[in-house]
């Protein structure tokens, strides 16, 4: 796997800070409380995968949140442009980060195996 350039890493880091600010300016309270786990920009910085954390949202709520985020993408991009001074901003593709759920399931499996070995 090739290392990311320093400029790309800086862009991702800055977006990871600015996107939550943009979300906090929106009127939908479900969007205000979302946490940004990771931002992964494409090489040309035209697209960015934004991984979000909403641990207490149901699958239906997550679908609705993603729909609202698609509608608010322009506002979020405008905020990022004004906050950073950039002349272009990547298109955002929002996804929920499920790595913590997977880790919790693995921990539960390991705990169950440990109990079975002890008995």
UniProtKB/Swiss-Prot annotation:
Gene3D superfamilies, alphabetized: 3.30.300.20
Intracellular or extracellular location(s): Cytoplasm
Annotated GO biological process: maturation of SSU-rRNA
Pfam families for the chain: RBFA
UniProt entry keywords in alphabetical sequence: Cytoplasm, Ribosome biogenesis
Disulfide bonds: none
Function summary: One of several proteins that assist in the late maturation steps of the functional core of the 30S ribosomal subunit. Associates with free 30S ribosomal subunits (but not with 30S subunits that are part of 70S ribosomes or polysomes). Required for efficient processing of 16S rRNA. May interact with the 5'-terminal helix region of 16S rRNA.
HAMAP family with a match to the protein in the record: RbfA
Family: Belongs to the RbfA family.
Name listed for the protein in its UniProt record: Ribosome-binding factor A
Phylogenetic placement of the source organism: Bacteria, Pseudomonadati, Campylobacterota, Epsilonproteobacteria, Campylobacterales
């Amino acid at each position: 796997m090739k290392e990311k350039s320093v400029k790309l890493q800086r862009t991702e880091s800055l977006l990871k800070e600015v996107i939550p600010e943009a979300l906090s300016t929106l009127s939908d309270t479900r969007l205000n409380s979302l946490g940004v786990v990771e931002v992964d920009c494409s090489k040309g910085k035209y697209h960015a995968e934004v991984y979000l954390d909403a641990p207490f949202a149901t699958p239906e709520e997550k679908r609705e949140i993603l729909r609202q985020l698609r509608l608010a993408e322009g506002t979020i991009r405008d905020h990022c442009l004004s906050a950073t001074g950039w002349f272009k901003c990547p298109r955002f593709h929002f996804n929920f980060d499920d790595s913590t759920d997977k880790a919790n399931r693995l921990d539960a499996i390991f705990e169950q195996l440990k109990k079975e070995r002890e008995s």
